[in-house]
Amino acid sequence: MSMLWYPKEYPLVTMAGMGGGATSLQHGGVVIDPTFAKLSSADADTKDTWTPVLSNNDLTAGPSASPGSNWHHGRTTLGFTTGKWYWEVTPTGNAMIGIEPTSENIDREFFNDSSSGLASRDGWIQFEGNEVVSGQSDWSDGDTIGVAFNANNGTIYFYINGSLSYSYDSTMSNSVFKKPAYSVYSGWTLTFNFGAAGFDETPPTGYQAISTGNGASES
């Protein structure tokens, strides 16, 4: 008796709702929830000695119990090389937020003293350790700071409560892997929203939440 062998057919993987409010991945009719970015506790993503203290399901970062006069740096669990990405931050105090290649030294003393990253705080931006934007609108405790980053061309936009406040066209490479980053100081905190439960403000057209469903990854 002869037997016929047929190649196994696999269902196609399709995206569902993968815009700014990315929700699910469909695989053969089965919905798979994507993983959204959080704040990383990995050694490679946090400053040695002065490591940020994470809470709120790893979405809020603060300093250690006895921080002294020291900045505490960290990055997110997920990052990207290219694409258009959006996330939100609610600050208390004058902590710093930004984005940097993961090749950057996370153990540096000052967050804004980087050789390749973007850092912002209260109306200014520094790129590669140099001040490139200053004197713009300050943010206040409890504001929603929207960050839109075009990893294809290096342009970063900062929104305060839904209104564009300032931006900068950097020359950050679109061939290096990068992650959102931050630094907190004594008494200051940052709470991040990566879109898992939706954003407080509407992302700019074409910008997506940082999730595996949208193509973000750990490395």
Describe the residue ranges of each PLM region.
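PRY/SPRY (B30.2) beta-sandwich protein-interaction domains
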Residues: 2-219
